[in-house]
Design a protein with these regions (language model features):
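Asp-based, Mg2+/Mn2+-dependent phosphohydrolase catalytic module
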Residues: 1-3, 103, 115, 119-225
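Short helix-capping segments at alpha-helix termini
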Residues: 28-32, 73-80, 107, 131-135, ...
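A metal-dependent, Asp-based hydrolase signature
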Residues: 33, 47-83
Length: 225
């Protein structure tokens, strides 16, 4: 069955989650990389734990809480950076090949969208900053159903809105756990494995693995292979 839509995860896939700390690396000091990793890991952990417990807080609130935890774990990083880091995260830099990849897919007549844990305001800020809006048909946020990926209800936002079958969607994510959830739902998934990480969740394998977004338009799954 031919692919009709390419749907992208946002954070880590289109937008660089470490760009905020990278911008202030000199000020953050020796613990900058560890600080950024903790911030990201705690952001995800809080989302998963809330969903598992049947509760919800929007992703921006969790991003703030996770940042505070990173400061607590890395006391050498100056807390005075907090406002600047949050401002940067609100308008995260896109990866260099993100815009061209979306443009190439749109040129093939495919629908394109974002499906993200991010809150609507976060996503709007990032999309506007990266100037991706013209190449997106939709931006879906979990905020509408108040539950986080990898729950199946999140992926159903796409099929319901576009009135298409799961197997007509190519879902693109750099997060292997997200690829697992989307594969379980029925999407045909592409894992963007920039860091050449070893695979996991073998029973929920992606149909393709790429190192960069600009490889997407040439994939044979576009023609339904």
């Amino acid at each position: 069955m031919p692919i009709r839509a390419f749907v992208f995860d946002a954070y880590g896939t289109l937008f660089d989650v470490h760009a905020a700390v990278a911008r202030y690396r000199a000020t953050a000091g020796a613990e900058a990389d560890r600080f950024s990793e903790i911030w990201r890991l705690k952001q995800l952990e809080y989302a998963w734990m809330l969903s598992a417990a049947g509760h919800y807080q929007d992703f921006w609130t969790l991003t703030e809480h996770a940042l505070d935890r990173a400061f607590a774990r890395c006391p050498s990083v100056d807390r005075a950076l907090r406002p600047a880091l949050l401002d940067c995260y609100f308008k995260l830099d896109a990866f260099a090949d993100a815009r061209a990849a979306l443009t190439a897919l749109k040129a093939k007549g495919l629908k394109t969208a974002i499906l993200s844990n991010g809150s609507p305001k976060m996503l709007a800020g990032a999309v506007e900053n990266a100037k991706l809006g013209a190449d997106l048909d939709a931006v879906f946020s979990v905020d509408t159903i108040r539950i986080y990926k990898p729950r199946a209800e999140v992926y159903a936002l796409v099929t319901d809105a576009f009135a298409i079958k799961a197997e007509e969607v190519a879902f693109v994510s750099s997060n292997r756990w997200d690829v697992m959830g989307a594969t379980a739902f029925g999407f045909r998934c592409v894992w963007v494995n920039r860091a050449n990480m070893p695979d996991e969740y073998p029973e929920f394998a992606p149909v393709k693995v790429v190192r960069e977004l600009n490889a997407l338009a040439a994939l044979d799954l576009i023609g339904g292979a």
